[in-house]
Amino acid sequence: MVKNFFKIAWRNLIKNKVYSLINIVGLAAGMAVAMIIGLWIYDEVTTNSHFKNYDSVYQVMMHQSFDGKRYSQQALPYPIGEELKAKYPDFKKVAMCDWGQKHSLIVGEKKISKFGHFIGEQAVDMFTLKILDGDKNPFREPYSIVLTDETAVALFASENPVGKIVKMDNSTDLKVTAIVPKPPKTSSLKYDYLIPWTLNEKINP
């Protein structure tokens, strides 16, 4: 019985090639669009969901107009952090963060290039940074650095890196204060290391 159904369906496909092609292409296109929409929804729902209070964490953007067009960007003046705290007391925590860039990290003869951010002290709570080892408040001192577990292994192998010194760009000595996991793929904040925002203010006044 089932075999006959397939035979009849095949004959109809051959007999009405144009209509069959239109139907098949339409079905394929519909399924592809549905999959794309599903992936987009999944991305929207899961992005930063590992933050403890992800539904209360927002990024401040700046609008600028050029030649009649409006643009949004992440670049903000340094004082904005303190201004937000002063003028909006409902903001429980505020953490400045730069765009991120690659720096050379050097330990002895080892030299690797990794991507990271200067970031504010309150980022630990805001972004639910899980401290695997080291200081629970690792951004208190400006000349410090937090490494992901992967970066720590790349620099120190099996040694405990906490308390050790990493030289950044062959010029700045930073003490490793904590180790954190590498952020998940669903995180909008990507990094191999994190450095206190206070150091950024010192070297980029």
Q: What is each of the regions a protein language model found here?
A:
Residues 5-14:
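A short amphipathic helical element positioned immediately N-terminal to and/or at the very start
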Residues 37-103:
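Membrane-proximal extracellular/periplasmic loop immediately following the first transmembrane helix
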Residues 16-43:
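Short, strongly hydrophobic transmembrane alpha-helices
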Residues 62-73, 96-122, 128, 132-145, ...:
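Short acidic/polar micro-motifs at solvent-exposed secondary-structure junctions
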Residues 120-132, 147-205:
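Mid-to-C-terminal secondary-structure elements
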Residues 11-12, 20, 40, 47, ...:
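Membrane-interface anchoring determinants
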